[in-house]
């Protein structure tokens, strides 16, 4: 079996590539990074190191690289005969690869390849595959859309694996945590006969995406912003401080109450165990993560539907507690990082505009009560 995977970065090689290889796929990695593509073609293999006791090595072979900037025709040809297409390139890049995927689907149609194909976006976003589908369909004519409707699925997925910041002399070397989770919405699949080992297939993905967003993303960001406020530079050092650990644990207790209220299929004890495992992952001494990486783009992370404001809104609607989340939001407005364009912009806005105006603009909140609470939280963190 052959897979085409867009994105030969650390997540692509260290998570998606590992899973595809373990399921017997030959993997065609697609990327514009010439160094990585050349190395894949020269060696046809690479090694993953688990960031865990023993630092186990995982060997991945039967791989090659395709440069979509220099040889798009080769990518189209690969999609035309692929058994599976996956991505791990970042949400903003999905629309950029959409024309190439559309050409690949047209080539499948021209070759009368009627084998069902799923295109799975493994991105840190909600509805990634369906978003990619929308972009792909913009580049298909009516006949192409009919072919895709019949034979091509775009099942949404939730993926979770921490890949720490790292530098290697070998461009293909990659280190990842031993925990991994990949969940696919089975209801959106076209090729239901192709199920990957270690991947979970579920009838409704939403609870799993929300669980990950409000546990891993909210918890990691809480650790980062609290740690930064208290003077730390790495997640590992920050989480050792009981103040930071308890802030993260408290934030997750609040999001847990929201998840249990929203989704009846979650068991409280199971969810608590899941979130405790999340906190243990942040404590992993083999993962050195800079706070500046985890806390980057604070304006985006303060957004209306993002990891803090959304649970705060929904907890308030349900009459549930959100005091730790609100306290963390106060610290986010004090985040200073000269190398982060959004952090610089946020501090400039706070200097030039009234605080309440910045809160409204950044969070999108209309609820006057919540705006007042955010304002009070920010002011309580003034030094």
UniProtKB/Swiss-Prot annotation:
GO MF term set: mannitol-1-phosphate 5-dehydrogenase activity
Residue sites binding NAD(+) per the record: 3-14
Family assignment from sequence similarity: Belongs to the mannitol dehydrogenase family.
Organism: Lacticaseibacillus casei (strain BL23) (Lactobacillus casei)
GO cellular component, one term: cytosol
Reactions catalysed: D-mannitol 1-phosphate + NAD(+) = beta-D-fructose 6-phosphate + NADH + H(+)
InterPro entries: 6-PGluconate_DH-like_C_sf, 6PGD_dom2, Mannitol_1_phos_5_DH, Mannitol_DH, Mannitol_DH_C, Mannitol_DH_CS, Mannitol_DH_N, NAD(P)-bd_dom_sf
Superkingdom to which the source organism belongs: Bacteria
Top EC category: oxidoreductase
Gene3D superfamilies, per database record: N-(1-d-carboxylethyl)-l-norvaline Dehydrogenase, domain 2, NAD(P)-binding Rossmann-like Domain
Enzyme Commission code(s) on record: 1.1.1.17
Protein's name according to its UniProt entry: Mannitol-1-phosphate 5-dehydrogenase
A GO biological-process term: mannitol catabolic process
PANTHER family per record: ALTRONATE OXIDOREDUCTASE-RELATED, MANNITOL-1-PHOSPHATE 5-DEHYDROGENASE
Keyword entries, A-Z: NAD, Oxidoreductase
């Amino acid at each position: 079996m052959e897979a085409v995977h867009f994105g030969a970065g650390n997540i692509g090689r260290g998570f998606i590539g590992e899973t595809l290889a373990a399921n017997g796929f030959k993997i065609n990695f697609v990327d514009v990074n010439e160094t990585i593509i050349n190395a894949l073609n020269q060696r046809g293999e690479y090694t993953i190191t688990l960031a865990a006791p023993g630092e186990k090595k995982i060997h991945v072979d039967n791989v090659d690289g395709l440069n979509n900037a220099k040889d798009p025709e080769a990518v189209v040809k690969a999609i035309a005969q692929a058994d599976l297409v996956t991505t791990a390139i970042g949400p903003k890049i999905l629309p950029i690869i959409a024309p190439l995927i559309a050409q690949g689907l047209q080539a499948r149609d021209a070759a009368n390849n009627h084998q069902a194909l799923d295109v799975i976006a493994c991105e840190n976003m909600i509805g990634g595959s369906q978003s990619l589908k929308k972009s792909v369909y913009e580049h298909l004519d009516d006949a192409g859309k009919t072919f895709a409707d019949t034979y091509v699925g775009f099942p949404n997925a939730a993926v979770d694996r921490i890949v720490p910041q790292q530098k290697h002399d070998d461009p293909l070397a990659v280190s990842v945590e031993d925990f991994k989770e990949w969940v696919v919405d089975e209801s959106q699949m076209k090729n239901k006969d192709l199920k990957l080992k270690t991947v979970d297939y579920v009838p409704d993905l939403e609870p799993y995406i929300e669980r990950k967003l409000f546990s891993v993303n909210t918890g990691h960001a809480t650790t980062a912003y609290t740690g930064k406020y208290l003077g730390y530079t790495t997640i590992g050092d920050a989480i050792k401080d009981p103040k930071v650990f308890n802030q993260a644990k408290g934030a997750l207790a609040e999001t847990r109450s929201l998840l249990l209220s929203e989704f009846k299929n979650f068991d409280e004890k199971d969810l608590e165990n899941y979130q405790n495992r999340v906190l243990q992952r942040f404590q992993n001494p083999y993962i050195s993560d800079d706070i500046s990486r985890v806390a980057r783009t604070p304006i985006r992370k303060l957004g209306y539907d993002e990891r803090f404001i959304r649970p705060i809104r929904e907890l308030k609607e349900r009459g549930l507690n959100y005091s730790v989340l609100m306290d963390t939001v106060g610290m986010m407005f004090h985040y200073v990082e000269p190398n982060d364009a959004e952090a610089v912009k946020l501090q400039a806005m706070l200097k030039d505009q009234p605080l309440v105006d910045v809160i409204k603009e950044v969070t999108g909140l209309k609820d006057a009560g919540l705006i007042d609470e955010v304002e009070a939280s920010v002011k309580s963190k003034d030094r």
